[in-house]
């Protein structure tokens, strides 16, 4: 058999030698001369105790019986770099070592046990044991006895291990640090925990007297009892269990025959000797397994040739392995798979592990986490969670359809990692065993990552990362995050546990200003919007939003879609208030020339051309119409000269306050306003004028009218249009006065419950204004007449939607009434349990009901006629609930059968449908009706 070559004067291992039972202290004695290990009394059991974190006396061998005490003192004074020389001198002084050893010293004995546990090679193919340092004929090593190899597999194994062990610059017995997690660890404190505990009874020098440790004795007795219990029951396991601490079962000499293990478990040969079959598993038969102990930690992995690491790096490797195997680490199997070894490695095929002892092993059981909790792990940083990759793994079916990436360290996932000066934490119960803190912290971290309803996309659109927030007021939009933040784990809708989980994880208070309609403090924001310096991320819908820096700087409230210096006609930068409306100089001159020249402009299209900064000169007819709709009149500059002008104030004492950036009563005029010097003038209320200014522009469906209509193409085009309209609804709601004062969950919930009502209501208004209710005006490029409705597969649904424009024609609804009714539709459905900001919601809804009454009063004179009109309009709003319910049912059925029908649903729309439509159809929402049925 090929012998392994040793470096320098060291002799190779003796092939076929018996395995040594001295697992805990491989450097301190020589193997027995006979086929069986020598006897060892229980009073020579090595101590397992905490040692100080220092290099003095850690890597030095225990003197043999024939060694001179002066040599021991000389060895204690050596540095870490002279370890090899120390072992050379130890070889020269051997002679009477025998099979027994002197009582171990505390520091070196524990180190031997720890290093044997952490650095033992896992190659099952080694058939020769590793003799201790006292043996002249073998080279020193830091490992325990090797696993026995069956005779047929020995040559193949030696062929594999020989080039690895003889590689240049490496020592015999080198092992990978990652194999540390696969060794059988003693019950109780892990080696990493023991090293980090303060050494109250262990001196810093190796020559100090030894004090017995009752804890270590208890641990070893427990292991011995466990080994005896394993003899009676249990299947045959591959490999052999390790005798912990070098003690045999029962405390006496253990005769280990070649075919049996020390614990009574017979050895089973491997299936394959060429490392192609599954590896021999070294399993400790514990029934039941102690909680906090990983079953994967008992599995032997392949031999990986890595040079011997220093102590801190070895612990780092073992701790990293525990981190990757710990299920309490937020990410579970998905997070472990993201950092798992290659598929060829036996670790890749290992079973999932139980909760390990990772989070608590860095602290004493009676201490709180400190800033220097990781002094031995150099620049160790916890890897970032990749939630989206986790969702694509084995747990994707148990989680939400979609989740978003969190870059960087997440305090909700790493509750015990101090990130800067931590806030005061609640008193933590002392864990009774390693891994208990990880178990208790798992629900807190899981609540954030599993908050997977569809509200995150809407929340990302509602709140965008900005610079310094503007001056806040009662209706000011709250800033989403502090400057410098880079990403955000956004919580999903309807999970009140999110804030609690972040508080339990020790996260800093969230950034959400205390806003209220009447100065009342606003409810706390979700814990997802984190402090400055923590990650935040948003999906690609942000280009639809306007930054908060462009918002109005009003001391009362500001609106992101109505900056103070934006032209209300084309969107260019406004130069002032011209002819009663805030416009740019170009639109001012155009309106003056068009009105004074009395031009008869005609639109070449359908009177719905887009008027913006680039295309404002394309169609003068549509531009002039938009000027008139905004309230521009030539006599607007001469209002102060008329004595009989009576201004109707828009808001009473209980209504919403007026912003500074909104034109006042003497500036905003009604559409197509004409007057004479002796005529009373009534002006549009400022809030109504504001609702006109934030009304979304025309949205196109992108439908190809050159191709024949098919059911799938029409439905796909409608879904694309619905996605764009949903984004438009979110942007519109951000600019709505009072809406941003509601809790973020309430905002998302209201949009999700009312988006279908808002879309069909807008469809009815466009059909009423553009085609007089004769067709369904979905978009300028998607207009369905009755013939196209009949050819589609949803003709009955089209007839249902057609009722709305017909009601508009019957009632002759004005634009002011439509705008107020549209806001009330946003506020007409709430959850059964109510909203978090229920008081602010009710005040906001009451304010817009009053605005609807004022809009009715602009056309209806008298109390009776106004009351009748109010009844008709509110009755129409109540009837929309039943109509929209039919649309919800059809939409959900189409979404479920989308693959069979070849219909595409966009991402954001799919999330809202999957998350909220089942709730609405199941009656889990409360419609707000004006009249009893």
From Swiss-Prot:
Crosslink position(s): Glycyl lysine isopeptide (Lys-Gly) (interchain with G-Cter in ubiquitin): 388
Domain NR LBD span(s) in chain numbering: 679-913
Keyword Transferase: no
Biased composition annotated in UniProt, kind: Pro residues: 418-429
Cross-link Glycyl lysine isopeptide (Lys-Gly) (interchain with G-Cter in SUMO), where in sequence: 7, 388, 531
GO cellular component: chromatin; cytosol; mitochondrial outer membrane; nucleoplasm; nucleus; plasma membrane
InterPro entries reported for this sequence: NHR-like_dom_sf, Nucl_hrmn_rcpt_lig-bd, Nuclear_hormone_rcpt_NR3, Nuclear_hrmn_rcpt, Progest_rcpt, Znf_hrmn_rcpt, Znf_NHR/GATA
Result after altering residue 294 to A: No effect on interaction with CUEDC2. Impaired progesterone-induced transcriptional activity. No CUEDC2- nor progestin-mediated protein degradation. No change in sumoylation
Residue segments, region AF1: 456-546
Zinc finger (NR C4-type): 567-587, 603-627
Region feature (Disordered): 1-157, 195-241, 331-351, 415-452
SMART domains for this protein: HOLI, ZnF_C4
Region (Mediates transcriptional transrepression (in isoform A)): 165-305
Keyword Cell inner membrane: no
Region (AF3) location: 1-164
UniProt family annotation: Belongs to the nuclear hormone receptor family. NR3 subfamily.
Entry's free-text remark on domains: Composed of three domains: a modulating N-terminal domain, a DNA-binding domain and a C-terminal ligand-binding domain.
Subunit-level organization: Interacts with SMARD1 and UNC45A. Interacts with CUEDC2; the interaction promotes ubiquitination, decreases sumoylation, and represses transcriptional activity. Interacts with PIAS3; the interaction promotes sumoylation of PR in a hormone-dependent manner, inhibits DNA-binding, and alters nuclear export. Interacts with SP1; the interaction requires ligand-induced phosphorylation on Ser-345 by ERK1/2 MAPK. Interacts with PRMT2. Isoform A interacts with NCOR2. Isoform B (but not isoform A) interacts with NCOA2 and NCOA1. Isoform B (but not isoform A) interacts with KLF9. Interacts with GTF2B.
Record PANTHER family: KNIRPS-RELATED PROTEIN-RELATED
Protein name stated in the entry: Progesterone receptor
Lineage: Eukaryota, Metazoa, Chordata, Craniata, Vertebrata
């Amino acid at each position: 058999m090929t012998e392994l070559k040793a470096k320098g004067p060291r002799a190779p291992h003796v092939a076929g030698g018996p395995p040594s039972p001295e697992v805990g202290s491989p450097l301190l004695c020589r193997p027995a001369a006979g086929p069986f290990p020598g006897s060892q009394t229980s009073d020579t059991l090595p101590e397992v105790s905490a040692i100080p974190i220092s290099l003095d006396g850690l890597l030095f061998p225990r003197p043999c019986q024939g060694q001179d005490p002066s040599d021991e003192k000389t060895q204690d004074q050596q540095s870490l770099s002279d370890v090899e020389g120390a072992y050379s001198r130890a070889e020269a002084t051997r002679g009477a070592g025998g099979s027994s050893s002197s009582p171990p010293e505390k520091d070196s004995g524990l180190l031997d046990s720890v290093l044997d546990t952490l650095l033992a090679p896992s190659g099952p193919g080694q058939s020769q044991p590793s003799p201790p340092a006292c043996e002249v004929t073998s080279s020193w090593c830091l490992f325990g006895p090797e696993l026995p190899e069956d005779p047929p597999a020995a040559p193949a194994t030696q062929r594999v291990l020989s080039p690895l062990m003889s590689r240049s610059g490496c020592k015999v017995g080198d092992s990978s640090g990652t194999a540390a997690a696969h060794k059988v660890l003693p019950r109780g404190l892990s080696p990493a925990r023991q090293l980090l505990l303060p050494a109250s009874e262990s001196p810093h020098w190796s020559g100090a007297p030894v004090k017995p440790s009752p804890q270590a004795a208890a641990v070893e007795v427990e292991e011995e009892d466990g080994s005896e219990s394993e003899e009676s029951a249990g299947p045959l396991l591959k490999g052999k269990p390790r005798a912990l601490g070098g003690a045999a079962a029962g405390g006496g000499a253990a005769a280990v025959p070649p075919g049996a293990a020390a614990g009574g478990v017979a050895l089973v040969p491997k299936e394959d000797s060429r490392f192609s079959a599954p590896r021999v598993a070294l399993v400790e038969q514990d029934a039941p397994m102690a909680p906090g102990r990983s079953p994967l930690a008992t599995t032997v992995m392949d031999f990986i040739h890595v040079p011997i690491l220093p102590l801190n790096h070895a612990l780092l490797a073992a701790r990293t392995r525990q981190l990757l195997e710990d299920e309490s680490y937020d990410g579970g199997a998905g997070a472990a798979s993201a950092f798992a070894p290659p598929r060829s490695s036996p670790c890749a095929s290992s079973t999932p592990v139980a909760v390990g002892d990772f989070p608590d092993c860095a602290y004493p059981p009676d201490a709180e986490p400190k800033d220097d909790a990781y002094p031995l792990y150099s620049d160790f940083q916890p890897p970032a969670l990749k939630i989206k990759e986790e969702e694509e793994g084995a747990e994707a079916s148990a989680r939400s359809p979609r989740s978003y990436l969190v870059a960087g360290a997440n305090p909700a996932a790493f509750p015990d990692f101090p990130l800067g000066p931590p806030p005061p934490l609640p008193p933590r119960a002392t864990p009774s065993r390693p891994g208990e803190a990880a178990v208790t912290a798992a629900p807190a971290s899981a609540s954030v990552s599993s908050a997977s309803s569809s509200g995150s996309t809407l929340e990302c659109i509602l709140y965008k990362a900005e610079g310094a927030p503007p001056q806040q007021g009662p209706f000011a939009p709250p800033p989403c995050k502090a400057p410098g933040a880079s990403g955000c784990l956004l919580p999903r809708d309807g999970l009140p546990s999110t804030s609690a989980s972040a508080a339990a994880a020790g996260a800093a208070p969230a950034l959400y200003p205390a806003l209220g309609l009447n100065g009342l403090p606003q409810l706390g924001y979700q814990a997802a919007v984190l402090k400055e310096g923590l990650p935040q991320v948003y999906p690609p819908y942000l280009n639809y939003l306007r930054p908060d820096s462009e918002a109005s700087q009003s001391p009362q409230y500001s609106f992101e879609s109505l900056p103070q210096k934006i032209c209300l006609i084309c969107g260019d930068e406004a130069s002032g208030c011209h002819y009663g409306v805030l416009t740019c100089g170009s639109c001012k001159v155009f309106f003056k020339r068009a009105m004074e020249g009395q031009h008869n402009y005609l639109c070449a299209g359908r009177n719905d051309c887009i008027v913006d900064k680039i295309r404002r000169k394309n169609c003068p007819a549509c531009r002039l119409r938009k000027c008139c709709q905004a309230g521009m009149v030539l006599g607007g500059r001469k209002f102060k000269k008329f004595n009989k002008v009576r201004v109707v104030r828009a808001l009473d004492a209980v209504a919403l306050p007026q912003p500074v950036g909104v034109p006042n009563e003497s500036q905003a005029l009604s559409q197509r306003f004409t007057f004479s010097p002796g005529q009373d003038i009534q002006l549009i209320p400022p809030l109504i004028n504001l609702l006109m200014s934030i009304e979304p522009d025309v949205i196109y469906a992108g439908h190809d009218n050159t191709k024949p209509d098919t059911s799938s193409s029409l439905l796909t085009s409608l879904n694309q249009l619905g996605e764009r309209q949903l984004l438009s609804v979110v942007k519109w709601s951000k600019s709505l006065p009072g809406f941003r004062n509601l809790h973020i969950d309430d905002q998302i919930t209201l949009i999700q419950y009312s988006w279908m009502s808002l879309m069909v209501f807008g469809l009815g208004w466009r059909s009423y204004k553009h085609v007089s209710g004769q067709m369904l005006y979905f978009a300028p490029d998607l207009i369905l007449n009755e013939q196209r409705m009949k050819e589609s597969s949803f003709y009955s649904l089209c007839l249902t939607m057609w009722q709305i424009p017909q009601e508009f024609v019957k009632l002759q609804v004005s634009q002011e009434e439509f705008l107020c009714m549209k806001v009330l539709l946003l506020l007409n459905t709430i959850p059964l349990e109510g909203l978090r900001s229920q008081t602010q919601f009710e005040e906001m809804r009451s304010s817009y009901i009053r605005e609807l009454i004022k809009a009715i009063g602009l056309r209806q004179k008298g109390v009776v006629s106004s009351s009748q009109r109010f009844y008709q309009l509110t009755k129409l709003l109540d009837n929309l609930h039943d109509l929209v319910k039919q649309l919800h049912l059809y939409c959900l059925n189409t979404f479920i059968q989308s693959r069979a029908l070849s219909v595409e649903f966009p991402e954001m729309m799919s999330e809202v449908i999957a998350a909220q439509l089942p709730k609405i159809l199941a009656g889990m929402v409360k419609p707000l009706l004006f009249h009893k049925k």
